[in-house]
C-alpha cells in the first residue's frame, strides 16, 4: 500500500493522471489544497509526496506564508527516504529544497514540445523513447541539484527531468496531462501565453490533446518504478 499526499497550489493544476494511476491500484490519495488552507501533511501521513505546479515561483517565500514550510517538508521527506515526485513548480521546489538555484529561463515554454532523454542510464527512465512530447507550461527553470542525475532536456530548457536516487523525481514538464487537466490549465492560465517562439496558442494546444494518450503509458511506467509497485502490486 502506498499512501499518497498531493500538494496542490492552484485550483486548475490537479494531480490528473497521477490520481488516475493511484486509483487504479487502490492507493489512498489525499490532496492538500494550499490555495484554500495552508495545511501541510506530517511525514507520518504519507509514503509518497507529490508536489504539483502553479503560477507562483519557488522563490516566493516572503509572499506566500506556506511556501517556506512546504520546501522544508519536501527536504525532510527526501531526507527520510520518502518517495517524492515534483511536477513543474513541484520540480523547482524539489531543486530549491536541495539547494539549487531557481530562476527565470531564457523564454517561456508553453505547449507541446519534445524532450530528449539524456545520455546514460537510469532505472526511472530506461526504456522510455529517446524523445517524447509532453505539455510544458513554465517560465522559470533551475540548476541541477548536487547529486542529482539529469534525465531529460529540451531545446531551450537544460533541466527538464532529474532524479535523486530512485525515489525522488522532478519533472519540469507535465507528463500527467489529461484532456481535462489541459482544458483546466487553459481556462485558468491562458492569459500567461504570449507570442514567443515556444509559446503555443490555445487552439494549437487543444489540437495536441492526443499526446495525453501517448504520455499515459510512460507515466505509468515511471510511477511504477518510482514507487516500486508493479501493475499488479497493491
Spans of features found by a protein language model:
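N-terminal beta1-alpha1 cap of cysteine-dependent amidohydrolase-like domains
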Residues: 1-82, 194-234
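Short aromatic-enriched loop/helix-cap "lid" or pocket-rim segments at secondary-structure transitions
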Residues: 18, 43-44, 162-164, 181-185
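C-terminal helical/coil "lid" or tail adjacent to the Rossmann-like core of SAM-dependent
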Residues: 167-168, 172-205
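Pocket-forming structural segment of enzyme catalytic cores
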Residues: 98-180
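Cysteine-nucleophile active-site neighborhood
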Residues: 51-122
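Glycine-rich, phosphate-binding/catalytic loops in enzymes
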Residues: 21-24, 65-69, 102-103, 153, ...
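Hydrophobic/aromatic beta-strand patches that form the interior of the parallel beta-sheet core
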Residues: 5, 30-32, 50, 85, ...
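Short amphipathic alpha-helical segments
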Residues: 18-20, 61-64, 98-99, 147-148, ...
Amino acid at each position: 500500500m502506498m499512501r499518497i499526499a498531493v500538494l496542490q497550489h492552484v485550483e486548475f493544476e490537479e494531480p490528473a493522471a497521477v490520481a488516475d494511476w493511484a486509483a487504479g491500484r487502490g492507493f489512498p490519495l489525499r490532496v492538500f489544497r494550499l490555495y484554500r488552507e495552508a495545511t501541510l501533511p506530517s511525514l507520518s501521513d504519507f509514503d509518497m509526496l507529490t508536489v504539483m505546479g502553479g503560477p507562483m515561483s519557488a522563490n516566493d517565500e516572503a509572499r506566500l506564508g506556506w511556501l517556506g514550510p512546504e520546501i522544508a517538508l519536501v527536504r525532510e521527506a527526501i531526507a527520510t527516504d520518502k518517495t517524492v515526485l515534483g511536477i513543474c513548480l513541484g520540480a523547482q521546489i524539489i531543486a530549491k529544497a536541495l539547494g539549487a538555484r531557481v530562476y527565470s529561463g531564457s523564454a517561456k515554454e508553453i505547449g507541446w514540445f519534445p524532450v530528449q532523454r539524456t545520455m546514460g542510464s537510469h532505472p526511472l527512465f530506461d526504456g522510455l523513447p529517446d524523445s517524447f512530447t509532453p505539455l510544458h507550461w513554465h517560465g522559470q527553470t533551475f540548476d541541477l541539484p548536487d547529486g542529482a542525475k539529469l534525465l531529460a532536456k529540451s531545446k531551450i530548457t537544460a533541466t527538464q527531468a532529474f532524479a535523486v536516487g530512485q525515489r525522488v523525481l522532478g519533472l519540469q514538464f507535465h507528463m500527467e496531462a489529461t484532456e481535462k487537466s489541459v482544458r483546466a490549465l487553459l481556462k485558468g492560465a491562458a492569459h500567461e501565453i504570449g507570442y514567443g517562439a515556444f509559446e503555443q496558442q490555445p487552439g494549437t494546444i487543444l489540437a495536441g490533446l492526443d499526446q495525453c494518450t501517448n504520455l499515459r503509458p510512460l507515466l505509468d511506467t515511471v510511477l511504477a518504478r518510482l514507487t516500486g509497485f508493479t501493475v499488479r502490486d497493491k
